[in-house]
Curated annotation (Swiss-Prot):
One of its GO terms (biological process) is mismatch repair. Endonuclease that specifically degrades the RNA of RNA-DNA hybrids. HAMAP family: RNase_HII_B (MF_00052_B). Its EC number is 3.1.26.4. The gene is rnhB. It is an enzyme of class 3 (hydrolase). Keywords: Cytoplasm, Endonuclease, Hydrolase, Manganese, Metal-binding, Nuclease. Manganese or magnesium. Binds 1 divalent metal ion per monomer in the absence of substrate. May bind a second metal ion after substrate binding. The keyword Cell division does not apply. InterPro entries: RNase_HII (IPR022898), RNase_HII/HIII (IPR001352), RNase_HII/HIII_dom (IPR024567), RNaseH-like_sf (IPR012337), RNaseH_sf (IPR036397). Its cofactor is Mn(2+); Mg(2+). This is Ribonuclease HII. Its main location: cytoplasm.
Length: 197
């Protein structure tokens, strides 16, 4: 009997004004379970980091994909999210040595894939593989934001991870946008217009 590999897929970073949208894809190993998987948004940063390391160690395979701020500006955030998810599954397939048999996607739509896929609304609370993918995506993106904070501390990315907050709006107004800001997002566009005028 052949084993059926099902991968969970989720994204992090659709809402922020800056940085890539990142997707994770994970095939869990039923013989090597990971305790405590749940939606990454409901976990502390320390717990996410711990579970991320557990996933790296115990999952059958995992993958990460992203779409850059430039790609987000060119094709819009929804299409960029689908692109990041497809890239994450491709990365996972490379590590697994084969395409998974099926992808379970968090949300209400699936990217175009060469395998069966099912969209599951609130899938990160229903499917452990999607929860694991959520953790991989969130930790990867948070690490990118911490790195970006080192390059641009004036924006306070370490505090808000690029999300639209009063502090982020104030920094945009004072400093304009950095090279990683998403120009197609209204608050960034307005900041650029006010700096230009």
């Amino acid at each position: 009997m052949s084993i059926i590999w099902v991968c969970g897929v989720d994204e992090a970073g659709r809402g922020p004004l800056v940085g890539a949208v990142v997707a994770g894809a994970v095939v869990l190993d039923p013989n090597n379970p990971i305790e405590g998987l749940k939606d990454s948004k409901k976990l502390t940063a320390a717990r996410r980091e711990y579970l991320y390391e557990q996933i790296m160690e115990k999952a059958k395979a995992w993958g990460v994909g992203e779409a850059s701020p430039t790609e987000i500006d060119e094709i819009n955030i929804l299409q960029a999210t689908m692109l990041a998810m497809r890239r994450a599954i491709e990365d996972l397939a490379t590590r697994l040595g084969a395409w998974p048999d099926k992808a379970l996607i968090d949300g209400n739509r699936c990217p175009e894939l060469p395998i069966a896929a099912e969209a599951i609304i609130k899938g990160d609370t229903k499917e452990p593989a999607i929860s694991a993918a959520s953790i991989v995506a969130k930790v990867t993106r948070d690490r990118q934001m911490m790195s970006l904070h080192e390059r641009h501390p004036e924006y306070g990315f370490a505090q808000h991870m690029g999300y639209p907050t009063e502090a982020h709006f104030a920094a945009l107004k004072q400093y304009g946008a950095c090279d990683q800001h998403r120009r197609c997002f209204s608050p960034v566009r307005k900041a650029l217009e006010s700096v230009a005028s």
